[in-house]
Amino acid sequence: MSLNPRDVVIVDFGRTPMGRSKGGMHRNTRAETMSAHLISKLLERNPKVDPAEVEDVIWGCVNQTLEQGWNIARMASLMTQIPHTSAAQTVSRLCGSSMSALHTAAQAIQTGNGDVFVIGGVEHMGHVGMMHGVDPNPHLSLYAAKASGMMGLTAEMLGKMHGISREAQDKFGARSHQLAWKATQEGKFKDEIIPMEGYDENGFLKVFDFDETIRPETTVETLAELKPAFNPKGGTVTAGTSSQITDGASCMIVMSAQRAQDLGIQPMAVIRSMAVAGVDPAIMGYGPVPSTNKALKRAGLTIADIDFVELNEAFAAQALPVLKDLKLLDKMDEKVNLHGGAIALGHPFGCSGARISGTLLNVMKQNGGTLGVSTMCVGLGQGITTVFERI
């Protein structure tokens, strides 16, 4: 395919192994250290990329306090081979933060404001809890439903509106673990996981090159035994059908097509379109529907043109209505989250957008796909989507 000089291409992608936030492999590793290790190793893997050419390190992170405060992008960048003459910024769109980081870099490239960017994100939910230091304005309840800030209840609401049964959610949750375990066993994550030192359950230092979050023993029957996590009376959303609380980071090297050509680099993919959209915060999980429809329209495509989709699995009760209204339910086993998703791998907020996008590119490569969509819902009612074409 022919590319325009200012087209945005993905050169490479890597991520850390996903660690459990409670006593997991990353319990003694700080978020900046995790991020810096990932950036350094990805640059080492791409010797044609000169770190001095990096215009900006754009890093997603939601809870920007404690070790994740004071512009963690810059903190991490200073710990890598990227010189201090390159800039760095931290961005937040809650769950969509690192996909927003990608979009910010892409928009800069498209407008001639840089050629080489490092993007990604991190969330160490074991060290910085998701509600640490958060003080929501009580007056928000005058403008949005009081439960809009309680993600599990918004998932309950969306599931009820779309008639999603408890059994359907349990099946989706079990599918995530089974597919993630299958991908692990078959080495499908090998290209994306960059090994990291961490600590096992006995406190011994070792190198991890796998996700410790996957539970291969998960079945529909075991999930059916769990109690509702958010609505004790009549609720259907459980811990087993919700994204796991985990620690992790993800990273991409992004370039203009012209610079990649000049350097003799074969990119993984080109960005065809991007979009964000808002929805009622009470049904925040529905955001991927309008954002994906908008992105597809901008690319001149329909959902039928798309070979593979990565949808962030915030909750099964949220993912299934999205797939239903995107006309993907009957194509799920062929196209959607073929390596599992956040129910098995977890959802470290700042990490997930780049993580699902990179996993999508590997799924496309492994299965011969050409067009792919990565999309996710965002707390307080947003959706964000990227359409990629594999090169």
Swiss-Prot record:
Heterotetramer of two alpha chains (FadB) and two beta chains (FadA). NCBIfam families: AcCoA-C-Actrans, fadA, PRK08947.1. Belongs to the thiolase-like superfamily. Thiolase family. It comes from Pseudomonas aeruginosa (strain ATCC 15692 / DSM 22644 / CIP 104116 / JCM 14847 / LMG 12228 / 1C / PRS 101 / PAO1). Coiled coil: none annotated. The active site is at 95 (acyl-thioester intermediate), 347 (proton acceptor), 377 (proton acceptor). Its EC number is 2.3.1.16. This is 3-ketoacyl-CoA thiolase. The lineage of its organism: Bacteria, Pseudomonadati, Pseudomonadota, Gammaproteobacteria, Pseudomonadales. Keywords: Acyltransferase, Cytoplasm, Fatty acid metabolism, Lipid degradation, Lipid metabolism, Transferase. Pathway: Lipid metabolism; fatty acid beta-oxidation. Catalyzes the final step of fatty acid oxidation in which acetyl-CoA is released and the CoA ester of a fatty acid two carbons shorter is formed.
